[in-house]
Structures are given as C-alpha cells and as structure tokens.
Amino acid sequence: MRLPITNRRAFLRATTALPLVSLAPLGATAFAQGLAGYPARPITWLVPYPAGGFGDALSRMLAQKLSESLKQPVVVENRPGAGGQIGANFVKQQPADGYTILYGDIGPLSMNAGLYPKLSYDTLKDFTPLTRLLVSPTLLIVPANSRLRTWQDVVEAARSTKGLNYGSYGTGSQPHIWMEMFNREIKGNLTHVAYKGGAPAVQDLMAGHIDLMLDVTPSSIPLVREGKVRALAVVGSEQRLPQLPQVPTVGELGLPGLNVPGWTGALVKAGTPEAIANLLHDELVKAVQSPDVVQRYTELGLQVAPSSRAEFGELIRTETSRWGKVIREVGVRLD
C-alpha cells in the first residue's frame, strides 16, 4: 500500500511568478532574522523510548552529525513510558525555539491518537514535522525449532481450535495491532501475549514460550542469520529484503493490504520559527544520508527515506487516519 505524498510543484509555480530580484534579499533577511544566532546553546534530542533500541542508536548517530554541522552539542535524552506519551508531552511543554527535537515512530506520532481517548497531545497541532528518517519493515518470526515451517503452516495452525500464541512489544504497539489485523484477515484464533518491550518477547519466542511474533529487522535479521529464529514473511516492503532473499513478502503471500511499513521521523514544537525548522530539516536530511548512516541501517534491513516537511506532515495525517480506523475495527483502547 503506497501512501499519498505531496510535492512542491504548486509552490514553485506560485513563487516563479514573483519578481526574483525582490525575493532574494527579502528571503535572506527573513531567514537571518528567523535564525537570530541559532543555535547558541546545546540542543536536546528527545527519545520517548528506553536506551538501547535501534531508535536510540540512530538518534545518537544523528545527534553526533548535528553536533558537528551546527557547532553545538546535541544531547540525547530518553524519556520512555505510556507508549511514547511522556516524551512527546515533555517536548510539547518546551519553548518553541528549536532547542528540543522529538524523535518518534508511527506509535506516538500516529497510532496513539486512536488508542488513547484522552491523549494529551495532537501530533499535527502541537508539533511541526521536520522530516521522515527511516522506513522500517518487520519480520514475522518463529522459534528455530518451531513446527511452523511456512506461512501456510501459520495460517492453518492459527485457524485450528487450539490456535497460536503471539507476542508483542506491548498492548497497542504496532506489532500487536498488525497481528490483530492478520488474525481478522485469516479468521484465525490467535491469543495475544503482551510484553514490556521487544527484548523479553524475543527471548520468550526463542525459548518456545510463544509461537510467533512480528519484530523489527534490526533485532530479527541477526537472529535469523545465527539460526536462533526463522523468518516466514516480510511486512512493509514491496520487495524481498536483500539480507534475506529467501523470505517472501506478505504481498507475495496474497495479503497486500497487510503490507504496511513502520517509519520514524523528527519534529519540533509547533510555533518554532520557520527558518529554524527549515535549517533543522536540511541538516537532518544531510545527516541521515551520510554514507556511514546509510550503510549501517541498510545492513539492518531499514530504508533511509528523508522527506520534505510537507511530505512528512501528510504522512502523519494519512497514517493517523488509517491506523485510527484499524484500531477501531480490532477494538483496542487504552486508558
């Protein structure tokens, strides 16, 4: 499923009709006034998850790149909890001055709006999107010694009276909602086991305490290569992953509607001066496209995919609508 992406053609058509001679000095003056010496002190990069995950690792790589380009320290701070709400609320409460950047993924930025009736922030009203950073496929994995050898084995076992147990990072997480979509699609009998994060879920999977789970590629690809788990399907990619060419996509397996990717991105508080938001966008795009960043995350099955600010805002809007509908259909609500 491809998401609608905006472009700048209408903007370019409008601006090319204006006198170029007058635009240049006005634009330069406005840009300089908007920056006003920014950045003049350290910047906080807020990660709404615990330290140690791939999002945290990516954040630290990008923070180092930004520190070098902006000539100011960029300090990564972890504020996990409540599905990313604690971190998002912290950024919402900071001044709109560009000194606090929110890193987030599809959970706190889109899915929470459908999960939490009393969510205390609105992503597109309270924050200014900067850029998408990564597109992240996932893998449906089973224990190495599982009797489930193929996708069809999973479908047949899930439809049986006994059914299957699947793990997730927690109630309301993307793997949880996706597995419920899958269960509805195949009319299966799956039982959810919620964990506090991906690591304990994967440990129980390898020990055989659960039958299957959906996991991000940075943690699952190494385990597949080491023979500790087996991957039966790729979710969120149009093509098979070059790291695991033997593993089919869910589109190939007849369920293209379930082929939805995850993604990550960066935002600042709404009201941040345009010049600062544009500067951060440009520097983040350069940082995430650095050869070492691209190599590192491509090896882990992720796609470096920066966007314009408008494109990222439209992505958040579209995903919030889509996941809100899915969450209502599967009946998951959190306090």
Residue spans for each PLM region:
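C-terminal lobe and pocket-closing loops
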Residues: S220-Q289, T318-S321
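Short beta-strand/turn micro-motifs at beta-sheet edges
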Residues: Q33-L35, D126-L130, G251-G257
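Hinge/capping helix and adjacent helix->loop/strand transition within the periplasmic-binding protein
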Residues: Q93-Y99, G114-P200, V250, W263-Q295
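N-terminal (or domain-start) structured segment
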Residues: F31-L124, K187-D211, V216, L223, ...
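N-terminal secretory signal peptides
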Residues: M1-P25
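Sec-exported extracytoplasmic/periplasmic mature domains
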Residues: A63, S67, K71, K92-A96, ...
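An extracytoplasmic/periplasmic, membrane-proximal ligand-sensing/linker region
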Residues: Y38-P42, G188, R225, E274-D335
